[in-house]
């Protein structure tokens, strides 16, 4: 080649430089969204909304409620290397913000048409600006490029339209809007999990419902459950590594890790370092090696980690998109994390599950095996669940005559005595000899906002794992009638449950769902409300008893219509609610039911408080009483077992929603499992 014909070296045009740089930073819509979310977080936003069209290729928009952008800063907003985050290179060692180069918005403006609407809290109106190739441009032909006043709320709205309109090769490579939307959804989910103090919404243009909506009221664990489902959330364990637990000064880590029983299609690592979403190949490999010691081949894991270290130990100026960072003592940090991970996995080693092994066909059956579409699967007997909650019990197959000969019917149970120091003997005897008539009334339709609100509270308080255990359990038997403990099996686990506390939630939820449609137990001998009140509260203050009686008499229409509690004008109780014809409450608790309706327990003048308080009192009235050691004879225990097996536990399985409080108080507690029992007895 002729030397003179060679192209000469010359500096590139600034516009070409900017487009090349933009291609490095903004590879796809996902990168633009990441940069804009981080800008919103830097601005102190507590609410971030993402709007997308065609996966962000035609339109992407970020709306936040942050501090906003000053009017004087708008001309420099999309100019390269213009930033408010640092003044000199040494500031990188003390960086507390996400942005620092001043390249994100500049890069977006070189490959898209950018519109910004922003307002400070002190401004009387918002400002609207349009940018092309890093500079202000007129919003419409003939207009001034200067920002224009407009209506708007505090914060900033940044819209980028027609992404890569001037980079045809990149635009032709990104044709799948659904794939881009999926990537952005995953990105927003990760930021939402980490920033639990910020609300995130992600929505497609034209959709009425957001594809992702996570409130700032949700904790990190709740957001993981919402995004990945209860199956993933139930296998997560807290991870915490304080500053004193590592040899690295100023280093700490927290998050969630999956236990040895976790299984999913693929592993998932969400890593934040100093609140930056980053990738670390070294840390990922270290985690995989640690999990490999405890998991079977092909198993997966879920890890969310937030690492915090001194800014001086972190180098964020490594990659154009800032997804890769370098930090000091990376080996020591990885070792500390993996050691802690190993400790947690060892403690949860009993939760490990093993894959089912396909049976290897013999040589003689090879041809048959090849032609078969399904392979025989072997289940190890220490993991073989031999029970099914849908199976009929042996007792249900026996005749009624046989059951009557073996034990008395639960409906004829002798009423226990009221154990109260100040009890009234005549009233107590009336309760003991109480005769009732069952009346089931036709259903009414009652539509109250307070009841809907209480029903919503029950649903929002649901503990998914505990509810699944109750929904799919197999009743085993009564353990301790004195402490109201029974045993159930769920899959390979054996659990003990406090059926007393669970009964309260069952009957309270029945009160809510059947509100205004209860049956009646009509008392053949009406009881004095004053006498019932005095059994619990004593008869020293007659004025309180009379005042309470007048209150119930004045509310007798409401009590009758809503709760099937019948009170005469003379202050006599003639009927109490019947929640189920298959179950009779312990009528010796009637004094406590009446006493629980006093104004000291709830506000009679507030509709929601009043209805809720009465339903709670009815639920407590229906809870089965514990049997004392003196009363624990064969007859009483058989009657209780019949009640548990034939009514209560089938109802737990059918309709109860277990609140988080019950699980936290260990009212449902796993005591062993089939693999553990097999290790002891070598048979199941």
Swiss-Prot record:
Keywords: DNA damage, DNA repair, Nucleus. GO terms for molecular function: ATP binding; ATP hydrolysis activity; ATP-dependent DNA damage sensor activity; mismatched DNA binding. PANTHER family: DNA MISMATCH REPAIR PROTEIN MLH, PMS, MUTL, DNA MISMATCH REPAIR PROTEIN MLH1. CDD domains: HATPase_MutL-MLH-PMS-like, MutL_Trans_MLH1. It is found in: Nucleus. This is Putative MutL protein homolog 1. Gene3D superfamilies: 3.30.230.10, Histidine kinase-like ATPase, C-terminal domain. GO terms for cellular component: cytosol; mitotic spindle pole body; MutLalpha complex; nucleus. The keyword DNA repair applies. Coiled coil: none annotated. One of its GO terms (biological process) is mismatch repair. Pfam families: DNA_mis_repair, HATPase_c_3, Mlh1_C. It comes from Schizosaccharomyces pombe (strain 972 / ATCC 24843) (Fission yeast). Its main location: nucleus. InterPro entries: DNA_mismatch_repair_CS, DNA_mismatch_S5_2-like, HATPase_C_sf, Mlh1_C, MutL/Mlh/PMS, MutL/Mlh/Pms-like, Ribosomal_Su5_D2-typ_SF, Ribsml_uS5_D2-typ_fold_subgr. This protein is involved in the repair of mismatches in DNA. Belongs to the DNA mismatch repair MutL/HexB family.
């Amino acid at each position: 080649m002729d030397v003179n014909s060679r192209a000469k070296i010359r500096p590139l045009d600034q516009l070409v430089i900017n487009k090349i740089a933009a291609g490095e930073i903004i590879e796809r819509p996902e990168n633009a969204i990441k940069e804009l979310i981080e800008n919103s977080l830097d601005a102190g936003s507590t609410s971030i909304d993402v709007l997308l069209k065609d996966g962000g290729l035609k339109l992407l928009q970020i709306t936040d409620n942050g501090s906003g952008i000053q009017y004087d800063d708008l001309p420099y907003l999309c100019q390269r290397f213009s930033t408010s985050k640092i003044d000199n290179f040494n500031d990188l060692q003390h960086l507390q913000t996400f942005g620092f180069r001043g390249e994100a918005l500049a890069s977006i403006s070189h490959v898209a048409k950018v519109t910004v609407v922003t307002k400070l809290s002190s401004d009387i109106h918002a400002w609207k600006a349009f940018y092309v190739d890093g500079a202000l441009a007129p919003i419409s032909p003939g207009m001034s490029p200067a920002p224009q006043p407009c209506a708007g709320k505090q914060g900033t709205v940044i819209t980028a339209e027609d992404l890569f309109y001037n980079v045809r090769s990149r635009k032709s490579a990104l044709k799948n809007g659904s794939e881009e939307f999926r990537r952005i959804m995953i990105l927003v989910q990760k930021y939402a999990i980490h920033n639990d103090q910020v609300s995130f919404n992600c929505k497609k243009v034209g959709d009425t419902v957001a594809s992702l909506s996570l409130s700032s009221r949700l904790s990190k664990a709740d957001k993981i459950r919402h995004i990945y489902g209860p199956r993933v959330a139930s296998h997560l364990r807290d991870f915490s590594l304080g500053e004193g637990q590592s040899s690295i000064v100023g280093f700490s880590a927290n998050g969630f890790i999956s236990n040895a029983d976790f299984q999913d299609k693929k592993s998932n690592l969400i890593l934040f370092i100093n609140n930056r979403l980053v990738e670390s190949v070294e840390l990922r490999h270290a985690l995989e090696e640690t999990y490999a010691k405890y998991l079977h081949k092909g198993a997966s894991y879920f890890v969310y980690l937030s690492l915090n270290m001194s800014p001086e130990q972190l180098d964020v100026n490594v990659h154009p998109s800032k997804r890769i960072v370098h930090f000091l003592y990376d080996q020591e940090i990885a070792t500390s994390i993996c050691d802690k991970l190993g400790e947690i996995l060892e403690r949860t080693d009993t939760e490990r599950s093993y894959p089912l092994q396909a049976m290897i066909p013999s040589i003689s059956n090879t041809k048959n095996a090849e032609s078969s579409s399904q392979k025989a699967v072997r289940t190890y007997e220490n993991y073989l669940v031999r029970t099914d909650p849908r199976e009929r019990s042996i007792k249900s197959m026996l005749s009624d005559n046989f059951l009557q000969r073996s034990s008395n019917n639960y409906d004829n149970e002798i009423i226990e005595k009221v154990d109260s120091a100040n009890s009234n003997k005549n009233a107590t005897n009336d309760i003991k000899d109480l005769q009732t008539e069952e009346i089931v009334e036709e259903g009414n339709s009652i539509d109250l906002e307070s009841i809907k609100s209480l029903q919503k509270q029950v649903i929002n308080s649901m503990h998914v794992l505990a509810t699944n255990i109750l929904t799919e359990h197999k009743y085993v038997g009564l353990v301790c009638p004195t402490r109201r403990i029974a045993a159930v099996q769920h899959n390979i686990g054996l659990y003990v449950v406090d059926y007393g506390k669970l009964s309260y939630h069952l009957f309270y939820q029945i009160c809510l769902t059947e509100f205004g449609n209860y049956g009646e137990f009509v008392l053949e001998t009406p009881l004095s409300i004053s006498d019932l009140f005095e059994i619990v509260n004593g008869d020293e203050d007659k004025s309180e008893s009379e005042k309470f009686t007048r209150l119930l008499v004045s509310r007798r229409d409401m009590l009758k219509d809503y709760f099937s509690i019948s009170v005469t004008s003379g202050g006599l109780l003639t009927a109490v609610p019947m929640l189920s014809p298959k179950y009779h409450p312990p009528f010796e608790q009637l004094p406590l039911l009446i006493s629980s309706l006093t104004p000291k327990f709830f506000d009679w003048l507030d509709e929601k408080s009043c209805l809720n308080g009465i339903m709670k009192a009815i639920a407590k009235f229906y809870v089965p009483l514990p049997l004392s050691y003196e009363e624990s004879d064969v007859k009483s225990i058989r009657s209780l077992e019949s009640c548990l097996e034939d009514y209560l536990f089938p109802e737990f399985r059918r309709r109860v929603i277990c609140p988080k409080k019950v699980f936290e108080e260990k009212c449902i507690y796993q005591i062993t499992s089939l693999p553990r029992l097999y290790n002891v007895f070598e048979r199941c």
